[in-house]
């Protein structure tokens, strides 16, 4: 288990080298990243890469804020860490990122059915300590009811994240989002992954036109229809151009977070291609 000092240690000049222009908009569109894209790096190496990429607003992957628990770690061990870790661990990350010009606008903390009330509450405390106004969650549909009171109390919106595989109690279809939001407060929202949505054979633009007030973040990736593979931006069926153009035309300040998942040669090189592709659309 990492100590805060080890977890956050870095060369003295790292934050300065990562500094980027503090304007999060590009031609009126917020183009950021889900730091899961840089999952092959620790929290400090991730920050350095963001500086190289000139990305200044992120949705933070929980793996960049929590220890790298080995596969198979008992849930009770993870829960114990979450319930006992000082919040200063998260405020230190926030300061390091903010000092480098990077805003953490969302925190990825995936509430599941086996989360205790205390563990749910801590997720909102972590988000607040990071300065995040949004939590994104690869959650269960039924868990929304349990999360809602905590979201209302914290006044932090929770964007439920979809995948492409259509199974009971998981988010994939428009109806799954509707079921989760039905009867809930305005704090239960949508984190729309447009690549997964297309892979499940749904139209992201059509969905956005109807539900944009409840969409708090978007994940940008390219996939083929019919549960197709993740591919380089522009090689799949995902209407990335149409989504970003719609956001620009309608002046939607919804963070569009690049999530790099296809197989490339070098992470930073591939993410740079993704960034350039998105920026070229809205330029």
List the predicted regions and their residue ranges.
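Histidine-acidic metal/acid-base catalytic patches
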Residues: 2-35, 39-57, 171, 178-192, ...
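Residue-level recognition of beta-strand->loop/alpha-helix junctions
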Residues: 37, 61-62, 108, 162
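Glycine-rich, proline-tolerant flexible connector loops at the mouths of alpha/beta enzymes
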Residues: 61-91
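Flexible loop residues that form catalytic
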Residues: 63, 112, 140, 163, ...
